[in-house]
């Protein structure tokens, strides 16, 4: 998050929409846990996504339950739209485009981050060079996970689409593209736009 704050510099009180955000994930506090008193955070996620959280976990957030690919808000409703590791899960290019259009319409400023398919370990299943395996190899592994001990991973990988840099440029043509590296490998890709003061 350090890079996000350095580049986007949201002001105290900024209205931030986290598309795909949750208050916690697998027991780990969410990205905004230390910032809920500084910013007005709204989490948008699919219906039912917040049901497993307690009232105290949700207390500092505004919540929207909707499919971001089919959601309408007032134009530029937020000072900033943030999305981390969501766009690769929404489906085909048409749905990716719907999500991108929603993000672009909800604010003049955005930060969209997604794992790089070039990183040696796939971010969701930890299989080396997953996106360079043949389709039949990937299908076989997903089938084994379904019928084994990893049905969640199977469902996740069945719906994940790699987002290459060229696709990000198509989806966000007026945004800056930057890459985060780890041990010399591209680990994540970020498209961002900061048109005016955030907040």
Task: Map each language-model feature to its residues.
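Conserved class I S-adenosyl-L-methionine
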Residues: 102, 109-139
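Conserved alpha-helix/loop element of class I SAM-dependent methyltransferases that forms part
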Residues: 1-14, 25-31
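Conserved S-adenosyl-L-methionine
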Residues: 174-185
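Class I SAM-dependent methyltransferase SAM/SAH-binding core
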Residues: 17-71
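A conserved beta-strand element that flanks and buttresses the S-adenosyl-L-methionine
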Residues: 82
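Short alpha-helix
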Residues: 154-176
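A short, conserved alpha-helix within the catalytic core of class I
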Residues: 90-106, 114
């Amino acid at each position: 998050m350090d890079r996000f704050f350095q580049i986007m510099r949201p002001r105290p009180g900024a209205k931030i929409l986290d598309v795909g955000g949750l208050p916690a994930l697998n027991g780990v506090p969410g990205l905004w846990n230390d910032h809920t008193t500084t910013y007005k955070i709204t989490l948008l996620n699919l219906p039912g996504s917040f049901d497993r959280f307690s009232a105290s976990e949700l207390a500092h957030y505004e919540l929207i339950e909707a499919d971001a690919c089919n959601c309408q808000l007032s134009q530029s409703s937020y000072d900033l739209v943030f999305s981390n590791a969501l766009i690769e899960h929404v489906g085909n290019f048409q749905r990716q485009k719907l999500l991108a259009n929603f993000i672009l319409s909800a604010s003049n400023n955005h930060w969209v981050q997604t794992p790089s398919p070039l990183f040696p370990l796939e971010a969701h299943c930890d299989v080396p060079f997953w996106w360079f395996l043949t389709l039949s190899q990937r299908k076989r592994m997903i089938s084994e996970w379904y019928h084994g001990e990893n049905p969640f991973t199977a469902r996740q990988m069945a719906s994940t689409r790699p987002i290459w840099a060229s696709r990000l440029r198509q989806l966000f043509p007026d945004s800056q593209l930057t890459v985060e590296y780890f041990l010399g490998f591209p680990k994540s890709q970020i498209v961002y736009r900061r048109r005016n003061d955030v907040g």
